[in-house]
């Protein structure tokens, strides 16, 4: 399978991130590594989407603080970014609506429809036109033949002037080499792109709680988009999925990260990081990156038990 025939993926994580922990970032890294190892996917970007203030969770600090902490946590990443759209809405948004927003945003920016799990495009990839020197579409010093997340997401996020997109009758993106001489011949490459929800096994297990999730939303989340699950505390994801008819129905759309890394809940837990802050526990450095800790102390967050 070539680079262009692999499915290109953007991982989207929704949550309180109150505060964002090292474990949250590790989930992105582990998910990307696992998807790459399958040989079927190329992860080109990750999106952290903090929940709206009206979510109403006890101890939830304002989105202004949570957005800044998330930005500090990913400031050295070349492929994970923080998106404020969910926080900037008038009220709380469902996970389903956040996924749909990002799908529709990509569609508006590129003029194409994103592929989803159930209807992948089967059209052959468009290659280089004849009589044209073979040259990688995406270039950087380290990997001249591979797209970089920063460049592709930058293209999507900046403006249409940085992306030229044809409108094929299939669910594909077409990125055009911005350095090509468009006056003579256009070099282009077609890739399939999906947005997948990244979550821990605790969120997957919450799908099994009657009445907690809207069933129509679950159908869209799992059936149309798909989920990448990072197990926590050796969770039995097969047992979890067997407890939900919707999860069983779309089991093939749920990718469980399988690796040899121990990923205890405490590493990800925002609750334990807040407790460590309140108690002056030096082990807070195990949970939070130093820039996040510095911001929390400067802003006097989580000092009181009330948050």
UniProtKB/Swiss-Prot annotation:
Cellular component GO terms, alphabetical: axon; cytoplasmic vesicle membrane; Golgi apparatus; Golgi membrane
Predominant place of localization: Golgi
Activity regulation, free text: Inhibited by P1-(adenosine-5')-P3-(nicotinamide-riboside-5')-triphosphate (Np3AD) and P1-(adenosine-5')-P4-(nicotinamide-riboside-5')-tetraphosphate (Np4AD).
Enzyme class: transferase
GO MF annotations in UniProt: ATP binding; nicotinamide-nucleotide adenylyltransferase activity; nicotinate-nucleotide adenylyltransferase activity; protein ADP-ribosyltransferase-substrate adaptor activity
Enzyme Commission code: 2.7.7.1, 2.7.7.18
Catalytic reactions of this protein: beta-nicotinamide D-ribonucleotide + ATP + H(+) = diphosphate + NAD(+); nicotinate beta-D-ribonucleotide + ATP + H(+) = deamido-NAD(+) + diphosphate
Keywords: ATP-binding, Cell projection, Cytoplasm, Cytoplasmic vesicle, Golgi apparatus, Lipoprotein, Membrane, NAD, Nucleotide-binding, Nucleotidyltransferase, Palmitate, Pyridine nucleotide biosynthesis, Transferase, Ubl conjugation
Gene Ontology biological process: NAD biosynthetic process
InterPro entries: Cyt_trans-like, Euk_NMN_adenylyltrnsfrase, NMNAT_euk, Rossmann-like_a/b/a_fold
Membrane topology reported for the UniProt record: Lipid-anchor
Cofactor binding summary note: Divalent metal cations. Mg(2+) confers the highest activity.
Residues annotated to bind NAD(+): 16-17, 92, 95, 200, 202, 212-213, 232
Chain residues that bind ATP: 24, 271-274
Metabolic or biological pathway: Cofactor biosynthesis; NAD(+) biosynthesis; NAD(+) from nicotinamide D-ribonucleotide: step 1/1; Cofactor biosynthesis; NAD(+) biosynthesis; deamido-NAD(+) from nicotinate D-ribonucleotide: step 1/1
Cofactor field: Mg(2+)
Free-text description of this protein's post-translational modifications in UniProt: Degraded in response to injured neurite. Degradation is caused by polyubiquitination by MYCBP2 after recognition by FBXO45. Palmitoylated; palmitoylation is required for membrane association.
Annotated lipid attachment (S-palmitoyl cysteine): 164-165
Subcellular location: Golgi apparatus membrane; Cytoplasmic vesicle membrane; Cytoplasm; Cell projection, Axon
Description of how the protein assembles with itself and partners: Monomer.
Function: Nicotinamide/nicotinate-nucleotide adenylyltransferase that acts as an axon maintenance factor. Axon survival factor required for the maintenance of healthy axons: acts by delaying Wallerian axon degeneration, an evolutionarily conserved process that drives the loss of damaged axons. Catalyzes the formation of NAD(+) from nicotinamide mononucleotide (NMN) and ATP. Can also use the deamidated form; nicotinic acid mononucleotide (NaMN) as substrate but with a lower efficiency. Cannot use triazofurin monophosphate (TrMP) as substrate. Also catalyzes the reverse reaction, i.e.
Family listed: Belongs to the eukaryotic NMN adenylyltransferase family.
UniProt name for this protein: Nicotinamide/nicotinic acid mononucleotide adenylyltransferase 2
Lineage of producing organism: Eukaryota, Metazoa, Chordata, Craniata, Vertebrata
Gene name linked to the record: NMNAT2
